[in-house]
């Protein structure tokens, strides 16, 4: 079975009693107090990384509290597979990912490819990645079928804690039956991890004939 999904990181969100654009129905005379200035405090920001299953109209969102890195992105994909992918597609023989061309899953990032190789070896499944060309990230279906509805669902609600954010994401649904699961990823991911030429050479990557820099398949180590 060839399985296709879309993934991306939503923009970072402030955690705390800050203004969140939109309106919410409340009792008259009972407005919710928020801070005037949105200076980042000790709770910081979160980076929601989404995995959207086009076939099932289901999604997983890992809410990161650290840096939005390639390691974080691949960990979100790993968690999706453990929690949703493997139970839904037990006979899968390969995976296809459509991803943005930049960000934590950018096509230029060596760490993205190295971390994917580790995941491929764990799953013993080849993973094909198709990056959207530069300047076309809004073509990513995850923007229109997941992130836009998450934004609608929490509009007007201050994102006061990590758990509130996770709960609001998981409560997102649509008239077409979108189902979302979410979890906080409390791991700390280091910025600026370097991947040497020697490490990159261990990635069993086969570029496709059409724009191999954007389209490629990573196979389990030693299989090709």
Q: Where do the protein language model's features map onto the residues?
A:
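Electropositive, glycine- and tryptophan-enriched low-complexity nucleic-acid-binding patches
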Residues: 31-98, 102-103
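Two-metal-ion acidic nuclease core segments, chiefly of the RNase H-like superfamily
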Residues: 112-128
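C-terminal His-loop and adjacent cap/lid subdomain of alpha/beta-hydrolase
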Residues: 27, 43, 68-75, 79, ...
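Extended hydrophobic secondary-structure segments that form protein cores and membrane-embedded regions
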Residues: 5-6, 94-101, 129-134, 168-169
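C-terminal accessory extensions appended to soluble enzyme cores
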Residues: 156-224
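RNase H-like two-metal-ion nuclease catalytic core shared by retroviral integrases
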Residues: 107, 129-151
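Short, conserved catalytic/metal-binding motifs centered on acidic residues
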Residues: 7-8, 57, 100, 140
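Active-site- or DNA-interface-adjacent structural scaffold in DNA-acting proteins
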Residues: 1-20
């Amino acid at each position: 079975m060839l399985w296709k999904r879309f993934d991306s990181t939503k923009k970072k969100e402030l955690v705390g009693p800050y203004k969140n654009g939109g309106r919410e129905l409340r009792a008259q005379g009972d407005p919710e107090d928020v801070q005037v200035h949105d200076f980042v405090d000790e709770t910081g920001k979160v980076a929601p990384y989404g995995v959207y299953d086009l076939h099932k109209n289901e999604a997983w969102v890992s809410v990161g509290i650290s840096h939005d890195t390639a390691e974080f992105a691949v960990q979100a994909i790993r968690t999706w597979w453990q929690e949703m992918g493997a139970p839904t597609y037990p006979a899968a023989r390969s995976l296809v990912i459509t991803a943005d061309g930049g960000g934590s899953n950018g096509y230029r990032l060596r760490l993205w490819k190295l971390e994917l190789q580790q995941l491929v070896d764990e799953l013993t499944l080849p993973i094909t990645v198709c990056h959207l060309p530069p300047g076309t990230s809004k073509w990513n279906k995850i923007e229109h079928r997941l992130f836009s509805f998450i934004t609608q669902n929490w509009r007007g609600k201050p994102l006061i804690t990590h758990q509130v954010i996770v709960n609001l994401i998981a409560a997102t649904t649509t008239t077409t039956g979108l189902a979302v699961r979410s979890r906080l990823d409390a791991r700390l991911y280091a910025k600026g991890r370097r991947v040497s030429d020697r490490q990159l050479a261990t990635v069993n990557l086969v570029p496709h004939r059409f724009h191999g820099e954007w389209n490629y398949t990573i196979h389990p180590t030693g299989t090709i």
